[in-house]
Swiss-Prot record:
Gene assigned in the entry: cobS
Name of this chain's protein: Adenosylcobinamide-GDP ribazoletransferase
Top-level EC class: transferase
Predominant localisation class: membrane
Source organism phylogeny: Bacteria, Pseudomonadati, Pseudomonadota, Gammaproteobacteria, Pseudomonadales
InterPro entries per record: CobS
Domain of life of the organism encoding this protein: Bacteria
Catalytic activity: alpha-ribazole + adenosylcob(III)inamide-GDP = adenosylcob(III)alamin + GMP + H(+); alpha-ribazole 5'-phosphate + adenosylcob(III)inamide-GDP = adenosylcob(III)alamin 5'-phosphate + GMP + H(+)
GO biological process terms, semicolon-separated: cobalamin biosynthetic process
EC number(s) recorded for this UniProt protein: 2.7.8.26
Amino acid sequence: MLPFWIALQFLSSLPVRLSGMPEPREMGRSLLCYPLVGLLFGLLLWLASHLLQGAPAPLHAALLLTLWVLLSGALHLDGLADSADAWLGGFGDRERTLKIMKDPRSGPIAVVTLVLVLLLKFCALWVLVERGAGALLVLAPVVGRAAMLGLFLGTPYVRPGGLGQALAEHLPRQTAGWVLLGSLLLCLLLGGWSAIWPMALALGVFLWLRRLMCQRLGGTTGDTAGAMLELLELTVVLGLALAT
């Protein structure tokens, strides 16, 4: 169970406290639990949506989005903001991009990106709420966190000595493949036919974003992994809103 608690502590704002620093091997194994953390988030969103039945759809969607952000402590939104600033401000240069990514300040590109992503997610949630498709909310958090596992499985980590390097080096790769397959089957089981098009769209976005990372950076960082998670969650909820 330790890898799950490590993953939950890292990916969420839930009050999880570990005694001491985990071993690198356990850190690597915690990646296997990322889709499970996503499933937990999705079930909490589904429960919240059920409890909010009867509330006006815009308020319902806004409260769901607020809970969604609070569950992760806006961790991945921070990565998205840093990546947006760095990608445009880096002008195609690897070292400049990495340097900007480490700057804690957010520029106008980061702000605009966050506003657009949250606005689109809010609108998609509004559509799903109005159509009574709250159960499909489980899918996006699972896909986003499974994508992080897939990214670390098949993409070099470019910041030596960082937490991400320990995760990537000690990830049980064969087991990770089975976890990804199980995550895919779970999403198809939960979403049925409604999940096929959004899942295919998410796969396409994953491959495109990974290609951009490899072309610019030669791999991934924690910030770009967080950005990918946010963009894939958005892709799934938009796909579901358009497909249902």
